[in-house]
Structure formats: structure tokens, C-alpha cells
Amino acid sequence: MMFATNFFVTSIILLFILIFLASAIKIVKEYERAVIFRLGRVVGARGPGLFFIIPIFEKAVIVDLRTQVLDVPVQETITKDNVPVRVNAVVYFRVVDPVKAVTQVKNYIMATSQISQTTLRSVIGQAHLDELLSERDKLNMQLQRIIDEATDPWGIKVTAVEIKDVELPAGMQKAMARQAEAERERRARITLAEAERQAAEKLREAAEIISEHPMALQLRTLQTISDVAGDKSNVIVLMLPMEMLKLFKSLSDAAEAYMKKKEEEK
């Protein structure tokens, strides 16, 4: 009976020793750090790897050092030019000081989320709609700087902030669509006017050449007649000016004189 009692007590003691040792051994991954509290007072961060703590007297709080992605929910706000918009964003951040992340704020993830929401509303409220639509990179940098400064006391580093979606009222979307259509029509008219101007310029240059060289017009007329006559299905009726007839006669006389000269040489 005594042996059984001693065995039971020994087993209980060994069990407590094993539990004690198991709770004293801590293994921290490469991307983690353990913030150690001894009797309620922080003594520093440990890791990565294997280390021991004193159970009951010491406590380890594990902090992830990897970059985390935080979705900022949709925020309803009004731009500087009084346009109501719905905007959401995404924040990339990581813990650079695990001790501050544990001791300076109760929940650093929730705190970063709240700061991001209020900052997003504030920055959008100070921007015009055109900036929100066309200068998003500038606003992203501004958001990143402000949120990073606000979370720095918590040991947080904000690496990037990106505005994801911008929702406009239906009426504003229709108005912008009409404006875009009007802008496309304006550019089309400008392009057409420029083409007409260039065509008019070419015609003016051609008119100047013809006025300086009347024979050029007659040669051009002959070329046109030759091109049209190439199609045998066409019936051509020409009303030639006297100048053109004179040109034909001069060409005929020149050809006849040339033939006579050849015959005389023979």
C-alpha cells in the first residue's frame, strides 16, 4: 500500500516537472519575435530559435514581423469640390519594433486600421475629384506618409498604401460620360479642321504652281485623259479649250517636221 502511494506521488511530481519544462521551452520562427515579460515588466525581445523562460514568473508574447495586408473598408466622404464619393484602400505594414507593438498599443492591427480609415477620409476630403481620379499615386504617397508617422510610436512601418476603388454617384458618372463624349467630339472636329486646312494649303500651292506655269495644267489634263482612256468601257466626251487644241496642233506640227527631217536624211 505504501509503495503504491509513493509511486502515485512520484508520478504526479514527474508530471508536473514535465509540464513545467514544456512550458519553459519556447521555439520562435525566423519571422517572429517573442516579447518577454517578467513579473509584469518587459525585459526585451527574443528569437528566432530555441530559448527558455521561467514559467509563472515569465510570459512570452509572439509578434509576427512579416509584412501584413490590411483592407481599409469603404469610406463615404466628400471631396474638396463637394462631390460625394465612396473609397476603399489597402495598407501594407510590418512590425519593426516588437516591444513597442506590444507595450505602446493594445492591438496594433486594429489601431492601424482605425488610423488608416480616418486618414483616408481626411486626405480625400482635401482633394478635388480630378486629383482623386488622375493623381492617385500622389494621394497614395500622402496617405503612406501620414499613416506611417502616426503608427511610428507603435513600432509599425507602413510600406505602401493604395487606393483601390472610387465609386461616384450615378448622376456624376453620367455627367462625366457626357463630358468625355463631348471631349472626343471636340478632338475629332479639331482633327478634321486640321486636315481641311492642310488640304486647302496643298490646293493653294497647286494653284500657285499652275498660275506660274500654265503648261503644267495642260499636261495634267492630258495625264487625266490618258488615265481615263485606259478603261475601254468608258465613253469619253471632251470639251477642250483652245489652248489645249493649240497644244495638240503644236505637238502634231513638231512630229510632222521630225518625220520630214528623217526622210530627207535618208
Curated annotation (Swiss-Prot):
Decide whether keyword Nucleus is in the record. Answer: no
| Main localisation | membrane
Q: Which UniProt keywords apply?
A: Coiled coil, Membrane, Transmembrane, Transmembrane helix
Q: How does it sit in the membrane?
A: Single-pass membrane protein
Q: Give compartment(s).
A: Membrane
Q: Which CDD domains match?
A: SPFH_eoslipins_u1
* GO CC, one annotated term: plasma membrane
Q: Which InterPro entries match?
A: Band-7_stomatin-like (IPR043202), Band_7 (IPR001107), Band_7/SPFH_dom_sf (IPR036013), Band_7/stomatin-like_CS (IPR018080), Stomatin_HflK_fam (IPR001972)
Coiled-coil region(s): 125-152, 178-213
Q: Where are the transmembrane segments?
A: 7-27
Pfam family example for this protein? Answer: Band_7
- Tell me the protein family, please: Belongs to the band 7/mec-2 family.
Subunit composition and interactions: Homotrimer. Interacts with PH1510 and is cleaved by PH1510.
Q: Name the chain's protein.
A: Stomatin homolog PH1511
Q: Which organism is it from?
A: Pyrococcus horikoshii (strain ATCC 700860 / DSM 12428 / JCM 9974 / NBRC 100139 / OT-3)
Q: What is the lineage of its organism?
A: Archaea, Methanobacteriati, Methanobacteriota, Thermococci, Thermococcales
